[in-house]
From Swiss-Prot:
Gene Ontology MF terms in the entry: low-density lipoprotein particle receptor binding
Function: Chaperone specifically assisting the folding of beta-propeller/EGF modules within the family of low-density lipoprotein receptors (LDLRs). Acts as a modulator of the Wnt pathway, since some LDLRs are coreceptors for the canonical Wnt pathway.
Cross-referenced Gene3D superfamilies: 3.30.70.260, 6.10.250.640
Location of the protein in the cell: Endoplasmic reticulum
Positions of glycan attachment: N187
GO cellular component terms, A-Z: endoplasmic reticulum
Family: Belongs to the MESD family.
Chain segments annotated as coiled-coil in the UniProt record: none
Name of the molecule in the record: LRP chaperone MESD
Complexes and interactors: Monomer.
Length: 220
């Protein structure tokens, strides 16, 4: 609202200046000092510079500032859970633009991906989440958030959907409900291997103890 009002005021000021310039007598205009550029010949770059100069002494609402000029949101360390690293990321990404990649399962066409992700976006919109969506492949889309603090809540919603294969957020891949067996088992592979290795070491140690006890009996 504030930005729109400033543009309207700027346009009105330029129009008044142009009208005043047109009404000046020809002789007076020639007698005056030569201007670098007629205001009626301003292009978009000139308008942008003029607006920037105008805004130097103007109070701009924080929400109208570009993201790189906004002051960082204060972090409430009392809300950080040491056992949940995601809680730290939520606070550090609050108020910042964030993107996540979403993969649709079932080898869909680009049109199907468009329809499915559109339904997800609509559900998020109804839940008051401001999300933009861009299709980047036959089965992939980007969900962009203006406030990254809500990214993990949106991720939880997406991975609970039947056709969501996975969500990639901040370099971390989260398997979705629609992931196939290999995707779902990916995170379980390492714990299972570690358990088997531990059991093998335990069994080996037990055999060595039995051999040592048997040898002691034979020596006696």
């Amino acid at each position: 609202m504030a930005a729109a009002a400033r543009w309207a005021a700027l346009g009105l000021a330029l129009w008044l200046c142009a009208a005043a310039h047109a009404e000046e007598p020809e002789g007076k205009r020639r007698a005056g000092p030569a201007k670098k550029k007629d205001i009626r010949d301003y292009n978009d770059a000139d308008m942008a510079r003029l607006l920037e100069q105008w805004e130097k002494d103007d109070d701009i609402e924080e929400g109208d500032l570009p993201e790189h000029k906004r002051p960082p949101a204060p972090i409430d360390f009392s809300k950080i859970d040491p056992g949940k690293p995601e809680s730290i990321l939520k606070l550090t990404k609050k108020g910042k633009t964030l993107m996540m990649f979403v993969t649709v399962s079932g080898n869909p066409t680009e049109k199907e991906t468009e329809e499915i992700t559109s339904l997800w976006q609509g559900s998020l919109f109804n839940a008051n989440y401001d999300v933009q969506r861009f299709i980047v492949g036959s089965n992939r889309a980007i969900f962009m958030l203006r406030d990254g603090g809500y990214a993990w809540e949106i991720k939880d919603f997406l991975i609970s959907q039947e056709r969501c294969a996975d969500v990639t957020l901040e370099g971390q891949v989260y398997p979705g409900k629609g992931a196939d067996g290999s995707e779902k088992g990916r995170n379980k592979t390492k714990p299972e291997k570690a358990k088997k290795k531990k059991d093998a070491e335990k069994s080996k140690s037990s055999h060595e103890d039995n051999r040592a006890q048997t040898k002691q009996r034979e020596d006696l």
